[in-house]
Swiss-Prot record:
Region Peptidase S49, annotated ranges: 388-736
Transmembrane segments: 23-43, 58-78, 96-116, 126-146, 155-175, 178-198, 201-221, 265-285, 298-318, 334-354, 367-387
GO molecular function annotation: peptidase activity; sodium:proton antiporter activity
Matching NCBIfam families: NhaA, PRK09560.1, PRK09561.1
Protein encoded by which gene: nhaA
Keyword Ion transport included in the entry's annotation: yes
Top-rank taxon: Bacteria
Family statement: In the N-terminal section; belongs to the NhaA Na(+)/H(+) (TC 2.A.33) antiporter family. In the C-terminal section; belongs to the peptidase S49 family.
Gene Ontology BP annotations: proteolysis; regulation of pH
Keywords (A to Z) from UniProt: Antiport, Cell inner membrane, Cell membrane, Ion transport, Membrane, Sodium, Sodium transport, Transmembrane, Transmembrane helix, Transport
InterPro entries per record: ClpP/crotonase-like_dom_sf, Na/H_antiporter_dom_sf, NhaA, Peptidase_S49, S49_SppA_C
Membrane topology: Multi-pass membrane protein
Protein name: Na(+)/H(+) antiporter NhaA
Location within or outside the cell: Cell inner membrane
Amino acid sequence: MNHSPQSARPVSIMRRFLDSEAAGGITLMAAAALALIVANSPFAQTYFDALHLYIGPLSLAHWINDALMAIFFLLVGLEIKREMLDGQLASWPNRMLPGIAAAGGVILPAIIFAVLNHDNPAKLRGWAVPSATDIAFALGVLSLLGSRAPSSLKVFLATLAILDDLAAVVIIAIFYTAEISMPYLGAAFITAAVLFVMNRMDVVKLLPYLISAVILWFFVFNSGVHATVAGVVAALMIPLKPAPGRPDDMTSPLHKLEHALAKPVAFIVVPIFGFANAGISFKGLEASVLGDTLTLGILLGLFLGKQFGVFGAAWLAIKTGLAEKPMGASWVQLYGVAILCGIGFTMSIFIGLLSFPSDLMQTETKIGVLSGSALSAICGYLLLRAARPDQSAANPLWKADESPEAKNFGRFLCVFHFASYIASTYCTERLQAASSLLRRSSLEFALPGLLKRLIPRRFRAVETEIPVVRLHGAIMTGGTSLRPTLSLASTAGILEKAFADKHAPAVAISINSPGGAPVQSRLIYRRIRDLAAEHQKKVFVFVEDVAASGGYMIALAGDEIIADPSSIVGSIGVVSASFGFPELLKKIGVERRVYTAGSNKVTLDPFQPEKAEDIERLKALQLEIHATFIDMVKERRAGKLGDNPDLFSGLFWTGTTAASLGLIDGLGDMLSFLRKTYGDKVKLKLIQPQRGLLGRKLPGIGMDSGSVEPAQIAAHLGDGLLCVAEEKAIWARYGL
């Protein structure tokens, strides 16, 4: 049969595409783009329903992520073994530069993510998500540059990505393992041992290895270890002959299998994974998702953490003589490849699915991965396209080069980082309105620290961070996690932590207390004033519902007191309350025997009739305490108090009246007042009691919930009933 040139041409084009280095990356990009389109089209429900369709014991999504991806990891394992024994990683000099760079590219993104999510254990599980590099995507982008990228850079990127994949496999095996089933795990070890014995006995036929690999996958899947690990273990057991072999050598079992899997994995397995997991529906998705620390942690980890980690580690290794720069590659090109390492699509999404069970967190993960990968791909490609080969002009940061090219590159680097900083800060400010009052925007606190050596000081955003301490509750000793109260013991720690902030010009204290023990009130007041003098900081007090009696005594520690117009303020007096049961014991047939050495030892005994002299003695004590309280008010509010005769009578007023009486300095709320004082860039940092890794603080200030035992709970319940009643009575005096 004769074939016309027209009929032969399409086949030739297809073959050239499949054989090209960029084909795998382009196919994966197309699959991801198609998934996004379908997920936001009229076919979205069909798409998501299909992924949750059960085929046997697993849904389609689980078959893809647990079974199909095991084939991907099998190929990864084969590549790792071949490179370690017969490739670029066969010698230590060749391993040093990509190995050190890969370590930096794993560690720094994880640190950035952990810094942004350290206060949320659920989100912190995803620390490894931004640590991976997608070899297909990255090499695909690099291949689009053609001859502009020297072959040494391609080898460096491929080797680094393989080591990155090895690190990801180890991370998955160690940190993302569910409950272990020892019988299945034991069976998996036995199967792996069989594979090892076959390798040592020089079994070269692939069929026994493949059958054993399927059995190994079954046991690993049921053991609790993620099933994809089975693919890597099986790959490491498939023999590679000691003699060096070419990539297309069909004599070695490893080369045979790698050659057979390369195209199916690149054009079937990975695109299916991308299509199944990149579909994000933007319907009903709030803008706040973009500003969530989970999304930002992944985005910044991939885009900034990868480039700084890889390039910084590589630069350090080269400058210290541990490794050599890739032949023919300039520093600019090496930096461009470091940016490309932030493309973490396949492995990053895969680790994200293992980290987070909830749909919302998985969506935030995918948004972070897609955004970070896209930024890395675009910026890396543009920089590499504009870069020149190894010349002194491309090395302005490390050589005294005054050429115009060197200066232009230096300007580009500064403008690039400055633009990244401004854009990130702007986006965060836009999203701040959607955040709660005291929620910190982690991006705005973390990013200046990362870039402060690159951005001139005069260009940095000026922000003021104010520590906030919440003092809420009745004032008395003996508080527990079940009945939190205010005392010097329970507040000293957070007060010291707040005042220890060297960069804060002031400390804000939020008070909501009806009062209580006068001694504890004065001790807390005194501690605040001592810390303010020691650290030379202003103290601003903000009254919420009530600052009465002892609560107002603590409020006097503020240089300025601000309240809401409806807040309750005042009650400058002293009250004592107790219960009397003089006839109770007789009625229930109980005789109480009391023996004293001192005539006044039974003063105000609740089981004896009240005596007039005892009442007079108590009132004398109250007058002394009241006088001390009045002196404190006059000292702290000197020149501000009005002439109202009821000022020290124990009456209390609304915030509006209290302002006219001089008991407070003004009306308003915390954020508005601090913005007016320190500018719109002010940030509030809530100071909380320290939390353990396993214990969680119950509301208020008290013991860790992890340390509360049933016996303690029972004791606290019995001991606290009357105290709770008394505390409720204190709040009730102010209608609360």
